[in-house]
């Protein structure tokens, strides 16, 4: 498979994010949001609210982290905050999903996007901490 074919396979896989219905209602209350909408809104929040971060952050990098963080839901599903059973194997499901989905990309891009996901999950950098802060804010 050519580099372009690998990239397009990944892009087509991302379309599945539109089918994952989350527990969170959109503000109007008319329906629940999907994961693609959730990720897009977080990406915008990364830029718009970055001046309020506790420490300086690279907003573009934060956007990468939040855009990558829920890609694993394509395989692992959205584990709801109150789903105790779902949390039992959440890490294993998400690791396997990350391996498969990011693995659709050419090796260099797979490693880069996987590093964004890993950074988000680790919550160690200023950008990852801010990403988690806006993730908490989106549910208010």
Model-predicted regions and their roles:
Residues 139-140:
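Conserved small/polar residues in nucleotide/adenosyl-binding loops
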Residues 10-16, 41, 64, 70, ...:
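Residue-level recognition of specific faces of alpha-helices
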Residues 8, 55-66, 127-130:
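Alpha-helical scaffolds flanking conserved acidic
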Residues 31-60:
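Alpha-helical phosphate/pyrophosphate-handling elements in metalloenzyme active cores
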Residues 5-8, 26-36, 121-128:
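Short, solvent-exposed segments of well-ordered alpha helices
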Residues 68-120, 127, 133:
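Divalent metal-dependent catalytic cores for phosphoryl transfer on phosphate-bearing substrates
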Residues 13-41, 81:
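Active-site flanking loop/helix segments enriched in acidic
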Residues 44-50, 60-79:
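Active-site alpha-helical segments that house and flank conserved acidic catalytic motifs
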């Amino acid at each position: 498979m050519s580099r372009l074919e690998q990239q397009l396979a990944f892009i087509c896989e991302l379309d599945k994010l539109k089918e994952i219905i989350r527990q969170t209602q959109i503000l109007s209350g008319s329906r629940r949001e999907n994961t693609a909408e959730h990720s897009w809104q977080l990406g915008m929040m990364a830029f718009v609210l970055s001046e309020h971060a506790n420490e300086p952050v690279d907003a573009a990098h934060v956007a990468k982290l939040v855009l990558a963080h829920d890609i694993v839901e394509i395989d692992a599903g959205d584990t709801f905050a109150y789903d105790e059973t779902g949390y039992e194997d959440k890490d294993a499901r998400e690791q396997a999903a990350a391996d498969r989905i990011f693995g659709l990309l050419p090796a260099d891009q797979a490693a880069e996007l996987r590093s964004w996901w890993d950074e988000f999950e680790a919550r160690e950098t200023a950008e990852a901490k801010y990403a988690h802060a806006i993730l908490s804010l989106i549910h208010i």
